[in-house]
């Protein structure tokens, strides 16, 4: 069968793109290397609790169009993200706000908080920050940095803050109100019944094959590629490049490809590896415990605690079950075969990515999108917006 598009990746980007194209009567097929839909927003029910398998995901946006779009595929509750930071035996509200400052210094007014922070910054005398530590100190002063920034950041990146470049932290929001809402967006919530249903509904009517990689699925291209061994029956080592349709090993053809995997992996890392940070999750079902920590997300900011946060999933949907599920989240170095979570957008990686973009431009009928395809961290609303924008561009191109 001939398809208009092969979408590689059934995460939010690929699913939203596929939905839009299917809605406009384009023939689309989707594949994913995982055994489930929804990518990193995948949720699974455990004892009546929707567990966020790849870390906490809270949907938030100020874009009414995107909010209306996601509400076509799920009903959202009114969850407000209000994480708590734990430093030793002290608890602090996030983001940094008057509740944080009052707990830290015993002050009550915004004027007192501003004065305290200004005094600490002035005492340090940092005018041109040379690393992340100096940058953070120049923004929030020593107390907030030492208790709430330093250890957490070093665990996230696996390096001392003095070894990290200053540009990683452009600003640290300070709010001088008693408001624990982490986000400032107009719309916010969690889909009742979890995120997986969104991908399922986005892909309704679209043929999907799970548990298969792009390399194992694709046979090759037709024109301009046979001489390089990229036609039907091509070797596993020669899938990229050339023009014309892509063929699957099952005999289907695809006029164009949307690839949402790692852009460097697509090109067999021919220019070198882009770097990522990975994560490891340790999940625990606690029978007979109806409430473990009283909040969905608690960050652990001291360096000595190996995990960065504990997620208690039932609080995302205000659960009342007699048991609870918690997940400890451990940052990890990334190497091939690991899940890539966060792109490391430093100077070296940004330059390398631009070189891969040049290679991608020569891929006549291949589009690259999403967090891995564009080597960029996206919030969920931006993922959807970018996917729909790409779909609209494709529809205009074919008009």
Model-derived regions, located:
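N-terminal Rossmann-like FAD-binding beta1-loop-alpha1 element of flavoenzymes
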Residues: 5-30
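Short, solvent-exposed loop/turn segments at secondary-structure junctions
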Residues: 11-13, 35-36, 99, 154, ...
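Glycine-rich FAD pyrophosphate-binding loop
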Residues: 22-44
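Central helical "cap/lid" subdomain
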Residues: 38-39, 49-54, 215-219, 245-304
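Dinucleotide-binding Rossmann-like beta1-alpha1 core, especially the glycine-rich loop
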Residues: 47-123
């Amino acid at each position: 069968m001939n398809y208009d598009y092969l979408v590689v990746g059934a995460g939010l980007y690929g699913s939203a793109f596929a939905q839009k194209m299917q809605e406009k009567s384009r023939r689309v097929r989707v594949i994913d290397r995982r055994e489930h839909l929804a990518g990193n927003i995948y949720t699974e029910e455990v004892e009546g609790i929707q567990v966020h398998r790849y870390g906490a995901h809270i949907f938030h946006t100020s874009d009414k169009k995107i909010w209306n779009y996601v509400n076509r595929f799920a009903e959202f509750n009114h969850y407000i993200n209000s994480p708590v930071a734990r430093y030793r035996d002290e608890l602090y509200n996030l983001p940094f706000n008057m509740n944080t400052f009052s707990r830290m210094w015993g002050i009550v007014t915004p004027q007192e908080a501003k004065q305290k922070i200004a005094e600490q910054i002035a005492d340090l005398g940092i005018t041109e920050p040379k690393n992340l530590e100096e940058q953070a100190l120049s923004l929030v002063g020593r107390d907030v940095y030492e208790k709430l920034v330093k250890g957490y950041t070093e665990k996230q990146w696996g390096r001392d803050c003095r070894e990290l470049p200053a540009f990683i932290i452009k600003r640290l929001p300070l709010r001088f109100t008693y408001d624990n809402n982490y986000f400032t967006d107009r719309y916010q919530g969690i889909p009742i019944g979890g995120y997986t249903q969104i991908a399922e509904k986005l892909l309704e009517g679209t043929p999907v094959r799970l548990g298969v990689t792009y390399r194992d699925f694709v046979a090759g291209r037709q024109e301009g590629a046979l001489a390089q061994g990229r036609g039907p029956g091509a070797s596993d080592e020669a899938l990229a490049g050339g023009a014309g349709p892509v063929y699957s090993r099952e005999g289907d053809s695809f006029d164009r490809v949307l690839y949402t995997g790692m852009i460097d992996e697509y090109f067999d890392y021919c220019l070198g590896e882009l770097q990522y940070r990975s994560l490891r999750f340790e999940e625990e079902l606690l029978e007979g415990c109806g409430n473990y920590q009283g909040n969905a997300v608690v960050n652990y900011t001291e360096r000595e605690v190996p995990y960065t946060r504990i997620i208690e999933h039932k609080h995302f949907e205000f659960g009342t079950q007699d048991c609870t599920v918690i997940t400890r989240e451990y940052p990890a170095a990334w190497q091939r075969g690991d899940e890539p979570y966060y792109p490391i957008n430093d100077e070296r990686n940004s330059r390398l990515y631009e070189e891969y973009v040049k290679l991608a431009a020569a891929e006549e009928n291949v589009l690259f999108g999403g967090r891995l395809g564009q080597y960029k961290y996206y919030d969920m609303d931006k993922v959807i917006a970018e996917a729909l924008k790409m779909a609209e561009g494709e529809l205009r191109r074919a008009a």
